[in-house]
């Protein structure tokens, strides 16, 4: 998982939107609890924003150079699938660099 340390090379910002209580956001909450500290320590200058909003569908947004943004809907994904979605966002940003 060497890609985890290079997130800040391809992304300018990572935003995760989730609901504090909905079952649809449960895997996303678990992902944040298990991975935030590690991701932030590997990418200390990358803004990683966790946005909680009642009733929102879980989503992950990546912002790249020139204001380009990509979104992945996390509804129905498991924690490993969310990690894979993040990896895909990182790799798609690296190909644009």
Swiss-Prot record:
Gene3D superfamilies (alphabetical): Glutaredoxin
- Which residue windows are transmembrane per the record? none
Disulfide bridges in this chain: 19-53
What's any one GO cellular component for it? plastid
State the source organism's domain of life.
Eukaryota
UniProt-listed InterPro entries: NADH_Ub_cplx-1_asu_su-2, Ribosomal_mL43/mS25/NADH_DH, Thioredoxin-like_sf
Q: What is its main location?
A: mitochondrion
Subcellular locations according to the entry: Mitochondrion inner membrane
Tell me what topology the record assigns in the membrane.
Peripheral membrane protein
Q: Which Pfam families match?
A: L51_S25_CI-B8
Keywords assigned by UniProt?
Disulfide bond, Electron transport, Membrane, Mitochondrion, Mitochondrion inner membrane, Respiratory chain, Transport
| Its job | Accessory subunit of the mitochondrial membrane respiratory chain NADH dehydrogenase (Complex I), that is believed not to be involved in catalysis. Complex I functions in the transfer of electrons from NADH to the respiratory chain. The immediate electron acceptor for the enzyme is believed to be ubiquinone.
Cite the record's note on assembly.
Complex I is composed of at least 49 different subunits.
Q: Which family does it belong to?
A: Belongs to the complex I NDUFA2 subunit family.
Q: What is this protein called?
A: NADH dehydrogenase [ubiquinone] 1 alpha subcomplex subunit 2
According to its UniProt entry, this protein's organism is Arabidopsis thaliana (Mouse-ear cress)
